[in-house]
A protein has these predicted regions:
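Glycine-rich, charged/polar anion/phosphate-binding loops
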Residues: 1, 68, 154-158
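Active-site-adjacent C-terminal substructures of enzyme catalytic domains
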Residues: 114-168
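Metal-coordinating catalytic core of metallo-dependent amide/deamination hydrolases
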Residues: 2-125
Length: 168
């Protein structure tokens, strides 16, 4: 059969907040957290090899405030579910994070507790050597998305050197 990992995504900051997502797709943080907990309690199967799992998945660093990142990773770890987000996907997004927080994306994620073997990032095309070292040291995963990145004419994550170095 097919294993189904439902990622409960969210966008909680919009353009009115100085973020990138349009305001008409924004949800309230408390609503997202409550719904994520509801999904975990009702549908997540923690058994090894389970067919249905729930994943905590705020969309990206530029689309949710610190409180959401900190509370959502805490919720996920309380229930032992994995967490996922888009990370370092495009130059404009990386520049936005750098200007807003004075840190690169993975450095910011680490500051918020969003690293570890229970976390994986989609894309990760804009990583510098320090970010790669953080990912390796913390056991954080990367989901390479070459087809998606080609549709948007973005870079692809250069996973070959990471795999050769081991620890990824």
């Amino acid at each position: 059969g097919i294993r189904f990992h439902l990622a409960r995504g969210s966008l909680t900051l919009g353009q009115k907040d100085g973020a990138l997502p349009p305001d008409n797709v924004i949800e309230k943080e408390d609503d997202v957290l409550a719904d994520t907990e509801r999904l975990i309690k009702n549908f997540h199967n923690p058994a090894h090899g389970a067919m249905v799992r729930i994943v905590n998945a705020p969309s990206s660093l530029f689309s949710s405030a610190d409180r959401m990142w900190i509370q959502s990773i805490g919720l996920a770890r309380k229930y032992g579910v994995q967490s996922h987000t888009h990370m370092a996907e495009a130059p404009d997004e990386e520049q936005f994070i750098l200007e807003k927080y004075g840190k690169r994306s993975v450095e910011r994620a680490e500051q918020l507790g969003w690293v570890g073997p229970d976390v994986w990032y989609a894309h990760a095309t804009m990583l510098d050597d320090n970010e790669k070292a953080i990912i390796k040291r913390t056991g954080t995963g990367i989901c390479n998305c070459p087809s998606s990145n080609m549709y948007t004419a973005a870079k692809v994550c250069d996973v070959s050197p990471m795999l050769r170095e081991g620890g990824f």
